[in-house]
Amino acid sequence: MPKRTLQGVVVSDKQAKTIVVRVDRRFTHPIYKKTIRRSKNYHAHDENNQFKPGDMVWIEESKPISKLKRWTVVRGEPKKTA
């Protein structure tokens, strides 16, 4: 079975070798048919501490690394500045 991959935005990088990624998802409510947005935070392993808040990253599930980390960063794009 292939590993799941999620796309999200870095929210925090205050921990060593760890980033917090917010992943947004959209779905239609089954009764009211309204589009709803929900988000969830994932702790991901960032070996080189290269990602900063605002960066777009792709994370992939992995074996447990610590109590909260079950995801690793696959690739990322720097934050777009105006």
UniProtKB/Swiss-Prot annotation:
One of its GO terms (molecular function) is structural constituent of ribosome. It comes from the Bacteria. Transmembrane segments: none annotated. Keywords: Ribonucleoprotein, Ribosomal protein, RNA-binding, rRNA-binding. GO terms for biological process: translation. InterPro entries: NA-bd_OB-fold, Ribosomal_uS17, Ribosomal_uS17_bact/chlr, Ribosomal_uS17_CS. Pfam families: Ribosomal_S17. Gene3D superfamilies: Nucleic acid-binding proteins. One of its GO terms (cellular component) is cytosolic small ribosomal subunit. Part of the 30S ribosomal subunit. PANTHER family: 40S RIBOSOMAL PROTEIN S11 FAMILY MEMBER, SMALL RIBOSOMAL SUBUNIT PROTEIN US17M. One of the primary rRNA binding proteins, it binds specifically to the 5'-end of 16S ribosomal RNA. Belongs to the universal ribosomal protein uS17 family. This is Small ribosomal subunit protein uS17. It comes from Rhodopseudomonas palustris (strain ATCC BAA-98 / CGA009). The gene is rpsQ.
